[in-house]
Amino acid sequence: MSQHPLRPAGSRPGDSPPDGSCPDGLAGGGSAVGGGGGGEAGPGAAGADDLVIAGRAYGSRLLIGTGKFASHRVMRDSLVASGATIVTVALRRVDIGRIGDGDVLDFIPPSMTLLPNTSGAVDAAEALRLARLGRAATGTGLVKLEVTPDPRTLAPDPLETLRAAELMVADGFTVLPYCSADPVLARRLEEVGCATVMPLGSWIGSNRGLRTRDAIEAIVASAGVPVVVDAGLGVPSDAAEAMEIGAAAVLVNTAIAVAADPARMARAFALATAAGRLGFLAGRGAAGPATVASASSPLTGFLGAHPSPASHPSPASPVPSVSRATSPAAVVGEASR
């Protein structure tokens, strides 16, 4: 099991239990459809349907954030429960002087891949500066690019995001940009060399769900890199919906962190993400017209072929008696007792 860069060897505060256990048996196991995979195999061990970013395989299609948790230990338990293999952390929250002595990084299981983010950056220059600090502190060239100058909506600035992406790619970073759900911008980000595009589902931290579905479907249809739906997913069914329309992965933070039981919610999101992916791979059947039903079972010929006219008793023939014990009414009566 690899150690985070700059993290001293040995036991430290917040390390996950040696057996990988999690409260209430919520640990997220691996899955061929991305429902977990945060165990010893770790990123890079290719599976049947792994998420692949910049040529590297990850066993879970659920990415998870680290903000807003009540404590570092609650965060750690939720990370383990999620089964995620990629965890994002705001570079502004990392205290380089305290790494190994209670910093947030010390509570992230070492098997997880760190994805530093530039949360709080208001322009391309600041985002690049934060990314370089993160690379120096963590040793990773992965970066989740965020440029959000509007404090009210935290909407990504499309011009500064594209400019920052160009600068970061030129500087050797593997860039995963948070962006508006704009198919044209997504294509431009891919063209400058971003490893993914990460369109928002709704405003950051809003828990309002997938409000940009049509635009994300358009992005998925033309993207040549993984599409990761980021921001606003509020309940597990939102994650399932994003995966069902073809997203490669989802990133969730607030919905898990502010839940009454964060670890259990993390596991729920893992299962929903896996279910949505499996549903996408299975292929949805064509939707029928809104005003016409289509029976899933035949409406005639139950229990065999149609009886011939000769099998019906003639009016002159006595109708066979049916004993109470075998009459439909008797059967219903017996069953209801």
Swiss-Prot record:
Main localization, broad class: cytoplasm
Catalytic activity: [ThiS sulfur-carrier protein]-C-terminal-Gly-aminoethanethioate + 2-iminoacetate + 1-deoxy-D-xylulose 5-phosphate = [ThiS sulfur-carrier protein]-C-terminal Gly-Gly + 2-[(2R,5Z)-2-carboxy-4-methylthiazol-5(2H)-ylidene]ethyl phosphate + 2 H2O + H(+)
Uppermost EC category: transferase
Gene Ontology molecular function: thiazole synthase activity
Disulfide bond sites: none
Region (Disordered), start-end ranges: 1-41, 302-337
Compartments (UniProt record): Cytoplasm
Residue sites binding 1-deoxy-D-xylulose 5-phosphate per the record: 205, 231-232, 253-254
Keyword Cytoplasm: yes
GO cellular component, one term: cytoplasm
Gene Ontology biological process terms from the UniProt entry: thiamine diphosphate biosynthetic process
Biased composition (Low complexity): 10-25, 319-337
Pathway this chain belongs to: Cofactor biosynthesis; thiamine diphosphate biosynthesis
Composition skew (Gly residues), residue ranges: 26-41
This protein's UniProt keywords: Cytoplasm, Schiff base, Thiamine biosynthesis, Transferase
Protein EC: 2.8.1.10
Active site per UniProt: 144 (schiff-base intermediate with dxp)
Quaternary structure and partners: Homotetramer. Forms heterodimers with either ThiH or ThiS.
The family this protein is said to belong to: Belongs to the ThiG family.
Protein task: Catalyzes the rearrangement of 1-deoxy-D-xylulose 5-phosphate (DXP) to produce the thiazole phosphate moiety of thiamine. Sulfur is provided by the thiocarboxylate moiety of the carrier protein ThiS. In vitro, sulfur can be provided by H(2)S.
UniProt name for this protein: Thiazole synthase
Naturally occurring in which organism (per UniProt): Frankia casuarinae (strain DSM 45818 / CECT 9043 / HFP020203 / CcI3)
